[in-house]
Amino acid sequence: MKVLQEKILNEGKVLSGDVLKVDAFLNHQIDPVLMQEIGKEFAKRFKEENITKIVTIESSGIAPAVMAALELGVKVIFARKRKSLTLQDNMYVANVYSFTKQETNEISLSRNHIDENDRVLIIDDFLANGQAALGLMSLVEQAGASIAGIGIVIEKAFQDGGKKLREQGVRVESLAEIASLDNGTVAFVQHETAEVK
């Protein structure tokens, strides 16, 4: 997605060979126009999948998930990382290791909002080692729902998360795939495009 790649190049900051800071438009301050375009792109890519619900994780996955849900006409449920006084019982639970925060979080979804009749699109802001996506998949599977695919805003293709998910037969659609963050520079995966005659 060209507009996203340009935003990453112009406003993203490489902090190390494996950390990209995008808090100017995605995971702290949010650019709503960009989120709208991201939502449209996810909706376009998954429109034939009969999605009934989008599942994401708090907090950075919420904005792109809501915009995609708006385009698809479905609801979003986000996995919580913290216990809530209003959500105590009747929860699906999984453990997720955060690469960025270097900690394990227990994530949960209420059983009241997802069931075996749902066809789910999972959306998240980043895909690195795949732990968040695997945790979300576990929650969806515990509910007996089917997974249509996973939509990722930014995939760090140099880490093994995408490979792990694809090897399990999961459809992963990433809007920007980063090949490298070496030497403080963002390099994107280059996909061959069919020649138009």
Curated annotation (Swiss-Prot):
Locations listed in the record: Cytoplasm
Q: Which pathway does the database say it acts in?
A: Purine metabolism; XMP biosynthesis via salvage pathway; XMP from xanthine: step 1/1
Listed EC numbers = 2.4.2.22
Q: Which InterPro entries does this entry report, sorted A to Z? A: PRibTrfase_dom (IPR000836), PRTase-like (IPR029057), Pur/Pyrimidine_PRTase (IPR050118), Xanthine_PRibTrfase (IPR010079)
Highest taxon in the source lineage: Bacteria
Question: What Pfam families does this protein's entry cite?
Answer: Pribosyltran (PF00156)
Annotated positions binding 5-phospho-alpha-D-ribose 1-diphosphate? 128-132
Where, in this chain's numbering, is xanthine bound?
A: 20, 27, 156
Q: Name one GO molecular function term.
A: xanthine phosphoribosyltransferase activity
Q: Where is the signal peptide?
A: none
Name any Gene Ontology BP term.
Answer: xanthine metabolic process
Q: Which reaction does it catalyse?
A: XMP + diphosphate = xanthine + 5-phospho-alpha-D-ribose 1-diphosphate
Q: Which PANTHER family match?
A: HYPOXANTHINE/GUANINE PHOSPHORIBOSYLTRANSFERASE, XANTHINE PHOSPHORIBOSYLTRANSFERASE
Subunit annotation: Homodimer.
Q: What protein name is recorded for this chain? A: Xanthine phosphoribosyltransferase
Species this protein is from = Bacillus cereus (strain G9842)
